[in-house]
């Protein structure tokens, strides 16, 4: 039995993993890659072109695990908007969560927002201005889904009081200055957001794909946020450019993590 078989067995034996099962699982490239990272033989992994997001995440959760103090791993996209777009910062925005958490609770949504801001700052190189989105702007609608966003906004501000963040905001109020001024005149974020946090995975996944296909924006990711080591997923509809850019993102994540 090789070192990697033994390592995976030790990680999963409490869950009923056998030595024979570990040997078989390690032949799966998703698990082998994560074990190489865990053992210090690799710095990051890019996968998903031929695998489902669920399979990629399962291997990462079992072997890499979340960062210390982090309970929510989420997925963000760095959106590279068409030249001349009036939105975002230098043609860039971050969308989250578009890949991992189906229906986040208010505390989970708050953590996704804070993680997305970090992604914008570290990988996008711009100062994040975070909007937590809803179908309501500042009380324009009453619903339990709106209440969740309001609570998430409150928690996120407590988690990161220095962060430029607001909610609940409708999408147009978040990114269009005139609409933001009209609908949320007291908000410092309305009309100028460059990080959009969606209330559910359903909304986030649909939105990033529509923006990508209808506007010609490039969607780099999903960038997995909150893992102890860089593991990133690709859409099975990805192009070679998507793979190339995600590899660069993963390398940057590794370099930055090693500098801390």
Predicted features along the sequence, with ranges:
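Anion-binding alpha/beta catalytic cores of soluble intermediary-metabolism enzymes, centered on
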Residues: 4-190, 195-260
């Amino acid at each position: 039995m090789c070192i990697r078989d033994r390592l995976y067995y030790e990680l999963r034996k409490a869950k009923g993993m056998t030595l024979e099962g570990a040997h078989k699982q390690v032949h799966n490239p998703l698990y082998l890659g994560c074990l190489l990272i865990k053992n210090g033989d690799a710095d990051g992994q890019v996968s998903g072109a031929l695998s489902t997001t669920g399979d990629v995440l399962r291997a990462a959760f079992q072997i890499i695990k979340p960062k210390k103090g982090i309970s929510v791993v989420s997925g963000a996209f760095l959106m590279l908007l068409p030249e001349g777009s009036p939105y975002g910062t230098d043609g860039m925005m971050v969308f989250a969560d578009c890949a991992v958490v189906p229906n986040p609770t208010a505390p989970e949504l708050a953590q996704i927002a804070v993680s997305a801001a970090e992604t914008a700052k570290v990988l996008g190189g711009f100062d994040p201005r975070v909007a937590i989105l809803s179908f309501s702007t500042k009380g324009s609608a009453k619903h339990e889904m709106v209440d969740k966003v309001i609570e998430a906004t409150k928690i996120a501000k407590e988690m990161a009081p220095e962060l430029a963040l607001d909610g609940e905001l409708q999408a147009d109020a978040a990114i269009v200055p005139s609409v933001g001024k009209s609908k949320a005149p007291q908000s410092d974020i309305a009309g100028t957001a460059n990080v959009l946090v969606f209330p559910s995975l359903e909304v986030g996944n649909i939105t990033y794909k529509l923006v990508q296909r209808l506007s010609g924006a490039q969607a780099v990711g999903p960038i997995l946020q909150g893992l102890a080591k860089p593991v990133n997923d690709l859409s099975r509809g990805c192009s070679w450019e998507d793979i190339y850019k995600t590899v660069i993102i993963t390398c940057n994540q590794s370099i930055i993590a090693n500098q801390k």
